[in-house]
From Swiss-Prot:
Entry-linked Gene3D superfamilies: Nucleic acid-binding proteins
Assembly: Part of the 30S ribosomal subunit. Contacts proteins S8 and S17. May interact with IF1 in the 30S initiation complex.
PANTHER family per the UniProt record, alphabetical: 30S RIBOSOMAL PROTEIN S12 FAMILY MEMBER (PTHR11652)
One term of GO molecular function: tRNA binding
GO cellular component, one term: small ribosomal subunit
Species in which this protein is naturally found: Aliivibrio salmonicida (strain LFI1238) (Vibrio salmonicida (strain LFI1238))
Protein name: Small ribosomal subunit protein uS12
HAMAP family attached to this UniProt entry: Ribosomal_uS12_B
Swiss-Prot/TrEMBL keywords: Methylation, Ribonucleoprotein, Ribosomal protein, RNA-binding, rRNA-binding, tRNA-binding
Protein backbone atom coordinates (compact mmCIF):
# COMPACT_ATOMS: atom_id res chain seq x y z
CA UNK A 1 0.00 0.00 0.00
CA UNK A 2 1.41 3.39 -0.99
CA UNK A 3 1.78 6.12 1.61
CA UNK A 4 0.06 9.50 1.26
CA UNK A 5 3.40 11.15 0.46
CA UNK A 6 4.13 8.64 -2.28
CA UNK A 7 0.68 9.26 -3.79
CA UNK A 8 1.17 13.04 -3.63
CA UNK A 9 4.46 12.71 -5.52
CA UNK A 10 3.14 10.22 -8.08
CA UNK A 11 -0.63 9.67 -8.28
CA UNK A 12 -2.12 6.33 -9.22
CA UNK A 13 -2.13 5.66 -12.96
CA UNK A 14 -5.54 5.90 -14.62
CA UNK A 15 -6.64 2.75 -16.43
CA UNK A 16 -6.59 3.34 -20.18
CA UNK A 17 -9.60 1.90 -22.00
CA UNK A 18 -8.62 0.54 -25.42
CA UNK A 19 -11.20 0.84 -28.20
CA UNK A 20 -12.31 -2.27 -30.10
CA UNK A 21 -12.97 -0.10 -33.17
CA UNK A 22 -10.13 2.44 -33.40
CA UNK A 23 -10.78 3.39 -37.03
CA UNK A 24 -14.17 4.91 -36.13
CA UNK A 25 -12.42 7.49 -33.90
CA UNK A 26 -15.33 7.57 -31.39
CA UNK A 27 -17.92 8.10 -34.16
CA UNK A 28 -20.99 5.85 -34.52
CA UNK A 29 -20.33 5.25 -38.24
CA UNK A 30 -17.81 6.23 -40.92
CA UNK A 31 -18.05 6.48 -44.70
CA UNK A 32 -15.57 4.76 -46.95
CA UNK A 33 -14.86 3.41 -50.43
CA UNK A 34 -14.53 -0.31 -51.17
CA UNK A 35 -11.08 -1.15 -52.46
CA UNK A 36 -11.66 -4.91 -52.70
CA UNK A 37 -14.75 -7.14 -52.35
CA UNK A 38 -14.10 -10.83 -51.75
CA UNK A 39 -15.06 -13.94 -49.79
CA UNK A 40 -13.07 -15.60 -47.04
CA UNK A 41 -13.38 -18.73 -44.91
CA UNK A 42 -14.07 -18.68 -41.15
CA UNK A 43 -12.02 -20.25 -38.36
CA UNK A 44 -12.61 -23.81 -37.23
CA UNK A 45 -15.07 -25.37 -36.56
CA UNK A 46 -17.19 -23.25 -38.94
CA UNK A 47 -17.28 -23.57 -42.70
CA UNK A 48 -18.65 -21.03 -45.19
CA UNK A 49 -17.70 -18.32 -47.68
CA UNK A 50 -18.14 -15.08 -45.75
CA UNK A 51 -18.58 -11.93 -47.82
CA UNK A 52 -16.18 -9.16 -46.77
CA UNK A 53 -14.73 -6.00 -48.26
CA UNK A 54 -11.64 -3.88 -47.74
CA UNK A 55 -12.68 -0.26 -47.15
CA UNK A 56 -10.63 2.95 -47.28
CA UNK A 57 -12.29 5.31 -44.80
CA UNK A 58 -12.56 9.09 -45.04
CA UNK A 59 -10.03 9.43 -42.22
CA UNK A 60 -7.42 7.42 -44.16
CA UNK A 61 -7.78 4.11 -42.29
CA UNK A 62 -8.08 0.93 -44.36
CA UNK A 63 -10.26 -1.70 -42.64
CA UNK A 64 -11.90 -5.03 -43.39
CA UNK A 65 -15.69 -4.97 -43.10
CA UNK A 66 -18.25 -7.77 -43.07
CA UNK A 67 -21.23 -7.64 -45.46
CA UNK A 68 -24.22 -9.17 -43.65
CA UNK A 69 -27.36 -10.65 -45.21
CA UNK A 70 -28.02 -12.82 -48.26
CA UNK A 71 -26.63 -11.29 -51.45
CA UNK A 72 -25.15 -7.82 -51.97
CA UNK A 73 -24.47 -5.33 -54.76
CA UNK A 74 -21.07 -4.05 -53.64
CA UNK A 75 -18.08 -3.83 -55.93
CA UNK A 76 -14.85 -1.88 -56.07
CA UNK A 77 -15.39 1.92 -55.69
CA UNK A 78 -18.79 1.46 -53.99
CA UNK A 79 -19.31 4.02 -51.21
CA UNK A 80 -20.37 2.33 -47.97
CA UNK A 81 -21.16 3.20 -44.36
CA UNK A 82 -19.20 1.26 -41.73
CA UNK A 83 -20.29 0.57 -38.14
CA UNK A 84 -18.47 -1.24 -35.36
CA UNK A 85 -19.04 -4.87 -34.47
CA UNK A 86 -16.67 -7.77 -34.98
CA UNK A 87 -17.33 -11.13 -36.61
CA UNK A 88 -16.25 -13.78 -34.13
CA UNK A 89 -15.16 -16.42 -36.65
CA UNK A 90 -13.30 -14.05 -39.02
CA UNK A 91 -9.98 -12.90 -37.54
CA UNK A 92 -9.25 -9.23 -38.22
CA UNK A 93 -12.82 -8.30 -39.20
CA UNK A 94 -13.96 -5.71 -36.63
CA UNK A 95 -16.49 -3.72 -38.65
CA UNK A 96 -19.84 -4.24 -40.41
CA UNK A 97 -21.18 -2.51 -43.50
CA UNK A 98 -24.54 -0.82 -42.94
CA UNK A 99 -27.10 -2.31 -45.34
CA UNK A 100 -29.49 0.11 -47.06
CA UNK A 101 -27.17 3.13 -46.66
CA UNK A 102 -25.24 4.92 -49.46
CA UNK A 103 -24.33 2.45 -52.26
CA UNK A 104 -25.10 -0.71 -50.26
CA UNK A 105 -28.62 -1.94 -51.05
CA UNK A 106 -30.88 -3.62 -48.51
CA UNK A 107 -31.46 -7.37 -48.53
CA UNK A 108 -34.08 -8.57 -51.04
CA UNK A 109 -37.25 -10.32 -49.76
CA UNK A 110 -36.30 -9.81 -46.13
CA UNK A 111 -39.40 -9.98 -43.91
CA UNK A 112 -38.05 -10.26 -40.34
CA UNK A 113 -35.33 -8.22 -38.64
CA UNK A 114 -35.67 -5.72 -41.49
CA UNK A 115 -34.15 -2.76 -39.66
CA UNK A 116 -30.79 -4.51 -39.46
CA UNK A 117 -30.71 -5.11 -43.21
CA UNK A 118 -32.01 -1.80 -44.61
CA UNK A 119 -35.41 -3.07 -45.78
CA UNK A 120 -38.54 -0.89 -45.87
CA UNK A 121 -41.84 -2.18 -44.48
CA UNK A 122 -43.64 -4.28 -47.13
CA UNK A 123 -46.94 -3.00 -48.50
CA UNK A 124 -49.37 -5.32 -46.68
Amino acid sequence: MATINQLVRQPRAKQVVKSNVPALEACPQKRGVCTRVYTTTPKKPNSALRKVCRVRLTNGFEVTSYIGGEGHNLQEHSVVLIRGGRVKDLPGVRYHTVRGALDCAGVNDRKKGRSKYGVKRPKS
